């Protein structure tokens, strides 16, 4: 067994999307099937322009009744602006989240369901 090494992804930023329309809202915007997202399985997805050009990529985590999106700080403001633009009359709340951190792990790690959310990066 190898000792795990943690690297803090200091360029990661988070936002949350919650509300009764959050599932449908994300399903209509992103490049992955939001229904595959669960507490134990995060998704890697993208937001594209109406012409199909890349705007942002992110990971999506499901936590209770809300979704957490993690993206690079370079794309964060653009992503937040576009999601708020597309919100229209959807019953969703989009909020910035400041108390979360992202880490890359190298080596073996035992999964503790209560304290860690992790999966293999599909990129």
Roles of regions detected by a PLM:
Residues 1-123:
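Basic, glycine/lysine-rich polyanion-binding surfaces/domains
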């Amino acid at each position: 067994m190898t000792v795990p090494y943690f690297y803090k992804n200091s360029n990661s930023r988070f936002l949350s999307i919650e509300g009764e329309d959050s599932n449908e809202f994300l399903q209509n915007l992103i490049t992955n099937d939001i229904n595959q997202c669960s507490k134990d399985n995060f998704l890697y997805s993208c937001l594209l322009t109406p012409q199909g050009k890349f705007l942002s990529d992110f990971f999506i985590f499901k936590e209770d009744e809300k979704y957490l999106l993690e993206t690079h700080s370079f794309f964060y403001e653009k992503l937040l602006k576009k999601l708020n633009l597309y919100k229209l009359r959807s019953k969703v709340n989009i909020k910035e989240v400041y108390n979360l951190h992202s880490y890359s792990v190298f080596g073996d790690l035992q999964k503790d369901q209560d304290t860690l959310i992790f999966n293999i990066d599909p990129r």
